[in-house]
Amino acid sequence: MDAGWKFDNSYARLPERFFSKVLPTPVRAPKLAVLNRSLAVKLGLNEEALRSEDGVAVFGGNQIPGGAEPLAQAYAGHQFGYFTMLGDGRAVLLGEHVTPSGERVDIQLKGSGRTPYSRGGDGRAALGPMLREYIVSEAMHALGIPTTRSLAVVTTGETIMRETELPGAVLTRVASSHLRVGTFQYAAQWGTIEELRALADYALWRHFPGFEEAENRYLFLLEQVIERQAELIAKWQLVGFVHGVMNTDNMTISGETIDYGPCAFMDTYSLETVFSSIDTEGRYAYGNQPYIGGWNLARFAESLLPLLDENEEKAIALAQGALDEYPKRYHHHWLSGMRAKLGLAEEQEGDQELIADLLRLMEAHRADYTNTFRALTLGEYTGMALFDSAEFREWQERWQTRLSQESVSREEAYERMRRHNPAVIPRNHRVEEALAAAVHDGDYSVMERFLEALSDPYAYSPEQEKYAELPPPSDRPYRTFCGT
């Protein structure tokens, strides 16, 4: 039975510096844990074939589909500010699948064994972190945030050693590409200018049609990546998503969210929110994400300098001019998104102050971020100390006055809010509940019901009510781990 794979592997035609050909390491007993049916349909794949013994063997790395050219990608990165050589240490790119509609996507196996870039690691992944990536990436997709996606997770029938023995798994990740800021840093540091140019031309061909018309195609590349990242990070902030590990190797050229290791969603609103156990200094805190985005983009610009202009001073001036636009573009996307969350379609001078005052009140009263906007959308002001305060009532009057100045009806304004304020997000305690049932009890029904609720986050359906509930009070802050 044919699964429908159609591989055409353009990355494998880049100079060999950018990859090492390597096969996934077979696993003992691959068994399908979860298959993303809607994504399989979108990719033009046959679900029955994917669920078959041969299909599952592909997901486990035990069988290579026809046309695939497995390889591990080379890249570098600034990890918590320190530059290092990296590469796919536990992932193998099977190749690029071209869908019936002509879309080209990477098909990567994560947890598929050692590669030349493993640096002492075992190349494997645990079931818990792979299911976490599946849940959160699907939630992000449903929220309308550009992201890599997960086609399948298989258990391996093997255990791996981390702090304890854990069940092994392999995740099949689907991405527009796996080109990263760190890929360009690697080329600039260790490649020739011809190799750097080949990579840049490839990125333009793959992601930015229309580059032929640009006066300076490499400046165009920089500007396009800046715009996509400004919009992406604004979208993160608008839903309270904390990535947790914004190293330059985890910033994509495509503008998709990648690497869900220590990520989490904010409950109580605070700019200082950090979940990652290794982010002890708060470098990647919620409120710092826009700044780190700019820092990473500056590293991207540095990598492109030899291509921007032969004259170094001119190249630096061009790069700086593009980078200066980032905070403006980020602020534009964030402010228009915040207006939408408050039902505002038109721009007025006092909007920024209105938004800032609400966020200040939320922080002062330790209000839940998602549920505050949910309450504003529904007009139901119960269950939070914030709503009992005189300051909030005064703010609410100002907001209602501002809403009355819109040219659209009040109903249309509230409909706008519904489209921008999710009723449900993957709350951390619910993610843990789903993972515990699946990993420890082999019960995937909790995860399936959770994914169903997350699949339409703006529905405001009765079935979503329980997933909007806050976690029980705890003395211990929620902590995440990268899973490597």
UniProtKB/Swiss-Prot annotation:
Transmembrane segments: none annotated. Mg(2+) binds at residues 250, 259. Keywords: ATP-binding, Magnesium, Manganese, Metal-binding, Nucleotide-binding, Nucleotidyltransferase, Transferase. Pfam families: SelO. It is an enzyme of class 2 (transferase). It catalyses: L-seryl-[protein] + ATP = 3-O-(5'-adenylyl)-L-seryl-[protein] + diphosphate; L-threonyl-[protein] + ATP = 3-O-(5'-adenylyl)-L-threonyl-[protein] + diphosphate; L-tyrosyl-[protein] + ATP = O-(5'-adenylyl)-L-tyrosyl-[protein] + diphosphate; L-histidyl-[protein] + UTP = N(tele)-(5'-uridylyl)-L-histidyl-[protein] + diphosphate. The active site is at residue 249. ATP binds at residues 87, 89-90, 110, 122-123, 173, 180, 259. The keyword Zinc does not apply. Its EC number is 2.7.7.-, 2.7.7.108. Its cofactor is Mg(2+); Mn(2+). Belongs to the SELO family. NCBIfam families: PRK00029.1. PANTHER family: PROTEIN ADENYLYLTRANSFERASE SELO, MITOCHONDRIAL. This is Protein nucleotidyltransferase YdiU. It comes from Geobacillus kaustophilus (strain HTA426). The lineage of its organism: Bacteria, Bacillati, Bacillota, Bacilli, Bacillales.
